[in-house]
Design a protein with these regions (language model features):
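Helix-to-loop transition at the C-terminal end of transmembrane segments
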Residues: 1-6
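Short hydrophobic/aromatic helix or loop-helix immediately within or flanking a transmembrane segment
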Residues: 8-12, 23-48, 143
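Transmembrane alpha-helices of multi-pass, membrane-embedded glycan-processing enzymes
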Residues: 31, 35-42, 55-70, 108-111
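Transmembrane-helix signature of polytopic, membrane-embedded enzymes
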Residues: 66-93
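Membrane-interface transmembrane helices that cradle and orient dolichyl/undecaprenyl
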Residues: 77-79, 113-133, 165-168
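Membrane-interface alpha helices of multi-pass inner-membrane proteins
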Residues: 96, 131-148, 154-161
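Short acidic/glycine- and proline-prone juxtamembrane loop motifs at membrane-interface regions
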Residues: 100-109
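Perimembrane helix-loop-helix junctions
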Residues: 124, 153-176
Length: 176
């Protein structure tokens, strides 16, 4: 069980020059990659680390709001406006841990949901936006890096893509 300070410090250590699998041997070190990207951006702009944790929390909050908005937009036709709104609010307020930070469990959950939303939108909107597949794959990779056991979800996603491709509506890359 990790706490917010530990999760934050992993990304900070990468920004300051520690190297994965060389100077860092924590079991959660790969979950430091997204936090390190956000921290590097913040320190490059601000020139200091003062306020960095608040910035990371704000980025997570904005990402959660965007995912919730996409969820609402994509599911309001299927489950109705009220059901989609309630579900989107639950998605927004749900936090796998007690803090809004860059820990591996939160990353695994949010990146998996983001990958699902990308693939779902790509499928339901007629395979017209291939960049969503790329974005979904990047989100899935971050999910797998944050919590390597979640790579088992790749098999489920792949089977889903194959089954959707067999319906005859998908691109030939999904047909097996």
């Amino acid at each position: 069980e990790i706490d917010e300070e530990y999760a934050f410090s992993l990304g900070f250590r990468l920004v300051k020059g520690d190297r994965l699998f060389y100077t860092m041997w924590e079991p959660h070190q790969l979950s430091a990659l997204p936090a390190a990207l956000v921290l590097a951006l913040y320190t490059a702009i601000a020139g200091t680390t003062t306020g960095a944790l608040l910035f990371v929390r704000a980025v997570v909050l904005v990402c959660k709001a965007a995912m919730s908005a996409v969820f609402y937009r994509d599911f309001k036709q299927i489950i109705g406006r009220h059901g989609a709104l309630l579900s989107a609010v639950v998605l927004f307020v749900y936090t796998p841990k007690w803090f809004l930070g860059p820990d591996y469990i939160s990353q695994q959950f949010h990146f998996t949901v983001a990958a699902f939303l990308c693939f779902y939108h790509y499928y339901t909107h007629g395979f017209r936006r291939p960049w969503l597949v790329v974005l979904g794959a990047v989100c899935a990779c971050f999910s797998f890096l944050a919590f390597p056991q979640s790579a088992l979800a790749a098999a489920v996603i792949f089977i889903g893509m194959v089954l959707l491709g067999r319906r005859g509506k998908g691109p030939t890359i999904c047909k097996i």
